[in-house]
Amino acid sequence: MQAIAIHKFARGSAQKARLVADQIRGVNVEKALEILTFSNKKAAELVKKVLNSAIANAEHNEGADIDELFVKTILIDDGPTMKRIMPRAKGRADRIIKRTSHITVIVSDS
């Protein structure tokens, strides 16, 4: 049995979120929540919300026991980038790139 949760268009780069995702891949969900709680990265909060949603989906939809769940798969994909302009001195302009990502967490009990 497995349950899925997805957060699309999460504000933050996929490269930074993958640093957090690599720490919890294949880990028991209780341990994963502990790791994310004490991480000081912004991406950890985003991943933690998606993980909690996947746990709730497993418990509600599948009737799974939380103690047996582990993070089977976690994917961080690039989302669309928002391009903005920042005015600079002497009539110039710099491009600001605001990156987004898609976070997918799959939890399983086997």
Curated annotation (Swiss-Prot):
GO MF annotation list: rRNA binding; structural constituent of ribosome
GO cellular component entries: cytosolic large ribosomal subunit
Any single biological process term in GO: translation
UniProt keyword list: Ribonucleoprotein, Ribosomal protein, RNA-binding, rRNA-binding
Family the entry assigns: Belongs to the universal ribosomal protein uL22 family.
Known role: This protein binds specifically to 23S rRNA; its binding is stimulated by other ribosomal proteins, e.g. L4, L17, and L20. It is important during the early stages of 50S assembly. It makes multiple contacts with different domains of the 23S rRNA in the assembled 50S subunit and ribosome. The globular domain of the protein is located near the polypeptide exit tunnel on the outside of the subunit, while an extended beta-hairpin is found that lines the wall of the exit tunnel in the center of the 70S ribosome.
Protein name as catalogued: Large ribosomal subunit protein uL22
